[in-house]
């Protein structure tokens, strides 16, 4: 039996997010849904996996709450369930940029996946990857800028430095991330710095793969995922990765550690 992997987020005021946690956890456990859901006063962010029937029930359950109804989600498939358990976490921020004194309510404009290739191929557009270095090491869009960050909280310092040294007075900026949520905040931060022409890939890399299949080959390599698939190609098929210690190929069934993109086989894990 195959599994459906669903990623989604929504920025919405959830004053009772503490109370939502046990309800969602119980529903997911009862319906054999596994993954991670993050709740904050700012909204919800999640990647979950289960049968198609279970996920249909889950989104119907969310529809009962007007704040969470009609969620748009990205869907892919996995031969094995990429999660071992169900976690529902509470956070102060839905996605932590580490900067509080800026207006994060107005982000950049969306670029649909179908129009993304033409947009970033323009000579007057600066394409910025908002992900971390360990993610970018697996793959990226051609000629995109790597901020070389270790975590998302490092992005503001890089952005401030880049703004001071920018080549153009008012550059056109295109930004992207895995599923879109980090761009909601990072584009808002760029606009807060004074940039006016800020855009981002709607739905992120995963939606781009699903919608375009990387038809123009502007994506190079794999996309890192925050689950046991570790990486997927432009057809959303999990790829093979190598153990960082011995170099042996590590298949999905043998995954032992995916901490920050570092993969260990069973043998090496036992000796660390």
UniProtKB/Swiss-Prot annotation:
GO terms for molecular function: oxidoreductase activity, acting on paired donors, with incorporation or reduction of molecular oxygen. It catalyses: uridine(34) in tRNA + AH2 + O2 = 5-hydroxyuridine(34) in tRNA + A + H2O. It comes from the Bacteria. Keywords: Oxidoreductase, tRNA processing. Residues 121-217 form the Rhodanese domain. Its EC number is 1.14.-.-. Pfam families: Rhodanese, UPF0176_N. It is an enzyme of class 1 (oxidoreductase). The keyword Aminoacyl-tRNA synthetase does not apply. The active site is at 177 (cysteine persulfide intermediate). InterPro entries: Rhodanese-like_dom, Rhodanese-like_dom_sf, TrhO, TRHO_N. Signal peptide: none annotated. GO terms for biological process: tRNA modification. Catalyzes oxygen-dependent 5-hydroxyuridine (ho5U) modification at position 34 in tRNAs. Belongs to the TrhO family. PANTHER family: RHODANESE-LIKE DOMAIN-CONTAINING PROTEIN 7-RELATED, THIOSULFATE SULFURTRANSFERASE/RHODANESE-LIKE DOMAIN-CONTAINING PROTEIN 2. This is tRNA uridine(34) hydroxylase. The gene is trhO.
